[in-house]
Amino acid sequence: MSLNFLDFEQPIAELEAKIDSLTAVSRQDEKLDINIDEEVHRLREKSVELTRKIFADLGAWQVAQLARHPRRPYTLDYVRLAFDEFDELAGDRAFADDKAIVGGIARLDGRPVMIIGHQKGRETKEKIRRNFGMPAPEGYRKALRLMEMAERFKMPIITFIDTPGAYPGVGAEERGQSEAIARNLREMSRLSVPVICTVIGEGGSGGALAIGVGDKVNMLQYSTYSVISPEGCASILWKSADKAPLAAEAMGIIAPRLKELKLIDSIVPEPLGGAHRNPEAMAASLKAQLLADLADLDLLSEEELLNRRYQRLMSYGYA
């Protein structure tokens, strides 16, 4: 599988190309006198060190690129790697089934949970079917239906956030996009079961918040969370999307900044080079975080859970 190196990773890409070339030569002619294995090992060590150096000093715009990486794991990847017995549930029981949001019942270490998350799609046909991860009102109403079901059966709710934003099409507006988002915000604040939200890629505006009100809010190390995309912000402030890197830095969209502002609880470390380099390791880290969060929330009564969530919401913003 291609790693799809980003622009700032080009020095790493060049080293990896050399490694691939030497490995191919070695396979073609095993009778070569020179010791290719030794050189390949040296280059691999150099690639790891270079990756560490580059990723130790990433800017907000580079993190935004990683959050959108075409090979980055999506909700269904984490469902497959970290959960068991997933049974997908479909439809909002009012209009349609929005494929941009997936949800269903699964087991996390044997415990039944309700999973809800954005799903972008990888190949062209799937991207179109999933609407590039941009939900319509029926997607948010499906999510709310599943949340209410989870509450009835006393199941914790786990959401995965990864969207550029809610779909802004005319049809979505006609069917009540803003109402669907607002209703989810209100109802999520009232749920009597634990709610754990994790930003796994892009956390885009109200489209993200509509499944993002929880008792615990986590972000993967190279994910973003913002009210608008860097390109959108740059287009408004500087009349040019070319200023997106400047906007990304100014907006404070990355996990460390949001944790500093107490908008999120935890940052889940990613494998060296990002989650797409090792989805299995990323899923294991995410699973450990979810289990730790559930253990904390299990100690609270329903009244304590609701009061804590209310206090959390009231603490947002500057005094």
Swiss-Prot record:
Instruction: Say yes or no: keyword Lipid biosynthesis present.
Output: yes
Q: GO CC annotations?
A: acetyl-CoA carboxylase complex
- Keyword Cell wall biogenesis/degradation present in the record's keywords: the answer is no
The EC number(s) attached to this protein equal: 2.1.3.15
Class in the EC hierarchy, top level:
transferase
Tell me the pathway: Lipid metabolism; malonyl-CoA biosynthesis; malonyl-CoA from acetyl-CoA: step 1/1
Report the protein name in the record.
Acetyl-coenzyme A carboxylase carboxyl transferase subunit alpha
Question: What is the species listed in this Swiss-Prot or TrEMBL entry?
Answer: Klebsiella pneumoniae subsp. pneumoniae (strain ATCC 700721 / MGH 78578)
UniProt lists the gene as: accA
